[in-house]
Amino acid sequence: MTQTKKANSYVPTIAPKTISQTRQDIKNYTDAKNMFLNADNPKRYPWYNLLDTIIVDLHLQSQINNRMLKTLSQPFLIKDLKGNLDQDLTSLLQNEKFIYQVNKAILQTVYYGHSLGEFDYVNGRLVFNLIPRQNVDPVNGYIFKDYTDDKKIEYRLQKEYGSWLIEFGNNKDFGLLDGCVPHVLFKRFAQSCYSELCEIYGIPPRVLKTNTQDRTMVARGEKMLKDMGSAAWFIIDENETFEFAQGVSTNGDVYKNLMQFCNNELSMGISGAVVGQDTKNGSNGKEKTSIGILQDLIDSDLSLIEQTWNTTIIPALKVLGVVTKDAVYTYPPAEDLDKLWKMTTEADKFKNIEVDPVWIKDTFGIEVKEVKPQSASGTKLNIEDYERFFV
């Protein structure tokens, strides 16, 4: 692959920042969103810092990975403008690391709204590095080396823009994670309450009635209750009484229901349906429908990648010298392999029809060998052939 020279790099100039791991609530969510939408001086770093804290939710991660990884694993094809497969260029790009990095940045625009990154060479191999979203203002076209500072670079006016430096997505879009933030915050609240309930469940409150006007007796009573622990005995004054109050009567269903509701909403937002592991009383038909809805979203993601490659990536790679001719990035059409296999086996039963073994291997991954015709000496007589046998 021909290596061209690059004038400026932007990722190494970004100042690293320590993100405070404080507890987030709905107020943080609304404040960050208001700063994002500020018309005079928009600041995006509080919003993306908030997304970095909620994206660690395991259920949310699993839903995003189910959709994104299935899209990234799809094989692609490079064709010329006439629709003919360019096998050499396809094989070359399939072995390049930057393909995965670029496609991931494109897909992340579905969840984050926007991605800005740059190509670079590392040990002679082309890579694609994402510029932290906290440091980018795509509405005005700015890159901030320090997102808390006002010093900026107008990246769309740089000569690297459109070749080394490329962007995807919508400048004003919050992405799908916007609707996920409240449910992750509610879920964390429910988890915290449920954890606290587990600590005190089954432990009844202890009540000591004493003379509150006597500070000595109050202090002695407090010390006794603190030191009592799980002991089965204690000493009190004859004027004091000790008893157990009514303990916790709930088993935490209200918290579990809230967590389940939040998980279901996260599944609906990312996958378009509540799939298998999230349902208690599902059915085969429902699961097939849910998987079909998820597949529709994956097909939409594949279409997004195709459009971005053909309008943005390939023109940039032509400037860099990676692609030297007109090309089209595409995915093979989706096929129902179960239905196709059934049709193939039925077609093979017809006389004078032969299914290509090479096509079977490429489509289904099955090694097929042609059956050698039996020799005349190995042919067995059939009673139905008696008319031809007797002369």
Could you tell me what each predicted segment is?
Residues 2-50, 74-228, 233, 237-238, ...:
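Structured, contiguous alpha/beta core segments that scaffold functional sites
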Residues 59-62, 244-246:
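Positively charged, small/polar-rich N-terminal and surface patches that mediate targeting and assembly
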Residues 73-80, 86, 243, 247, ...:
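Charge-rich, low-complexity amphipathic helices
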Residues 99, 107, 261-391:
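C-terminal helix-loop subdomains that flank or include functional centers
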Residues 126-129, 216-220, 243-247, 335-344:
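Short, solvent-exposed polar/charged micro-motifs at secondary-structure junctions
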Residues 187, 191-311, 315:
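A contiguous, surface-oriented mixed alpha/beta subdomain in the mid-to-C-terminal portion of proteins
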